[in-house]
Amino acid sequence: MKRLKIFLYLGLVFLAYPSWMEARHIPPIVSTQWLNARIGDPSLTILDVRRVEAYQEGHIPGAINVYAGAWAYKKGVLFNEIPDQAELNETIGAVGISLSSAVVVVGNMDTVREGYQTIRVACTLLYAGLEDVAVLDGGMNKWVKENRPLSQKVVKPIPREFQGRYRTDLFADKAYVKENLGKIILVDVREPAYYSGEKKLDCVARPGHIPGAYNLPTSCAFNSDGTFKTKEELLVIAESVTGAGRDREIITYCDTGQCCPTWHFIMRELLGFPRVRIYDGSMQEWGADERAPVTK
């Protein structure tokens, strides 16, 4: 009986680490100390997604720069949409990244907009088929505060042809969300005032949220200095809306698709939730469709 319990325990541990997590060679969230020890490692690509002016003022030695805006674009009236695959192949190939590359995405994590953009870039690379993608915990602001090395040398990558293995199951469109209402766990990552309909952005036609959605603000995932909360804390927060079971599919959304990748990244890459998607169109698209239900 004791041996059986041990086997059962090991089986549960195995199930806790899905295949994509086992395939990783770097953790999804890396510390400044971890990255500092690997400066100059030819097997690691440091991708700085800040604006070029900030990059030129000082960046982590060896980092290449592609502004976060290049990794999402306006599609019709919708902001922050995932690029077409051909365009994304070109963007990734231009900076010399391959499917086997290990990439650490670096941005400023002490500002809401830039922090969310940084994580969205990481999710975009995962969508393209990379496995070893991480974000720098605390971002450049923490790196600079700790007086870690900086460089002003502009790094010119060697372009290469890139052909992604696209994980279309990481995203959901409006039709998919509509069809699966009541079957999926919808996670609205906006602040409570926007979830409740008390406030709304100008680009969102109707205030409120998708019926049945739980509110899990993205800001809950971070400490005041822009670092992530601990894995244990994040699991407790995530399970407050998803429950302990992991069988149901989870779809995250926000206003324009900019900040909902954060909880997607945390749940899937750090916590190992097996079925998590991003609704890219989010409330900007949903609210514009009069046939799509909205509640307060």
Model features per residue range: what roles?
Residues 51-54, 69-73, 109-113, 140-142, ...:
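Solvent-exposed loop/turn segments at secondary-structure junctions
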Residues 1-8, 19:
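Bacterial N-terminal signal peptides that target proteins for export
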Residues 73-102, 218-250:
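Helix-loop module immediately N-terminal to the HCX5R catalytic loop
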Residues 43-85:
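N-terminal, post-signal-peptide region of Sec/Tat-exported proteins
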Residues 82-176, 199, 208, 259-276, ...:
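Thiolate-centered catalytic microenvironments shared by cysteine-dependent enzyme domains
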Residues 10, 19-21, 257:
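Cleavable N-terminal signal peptides
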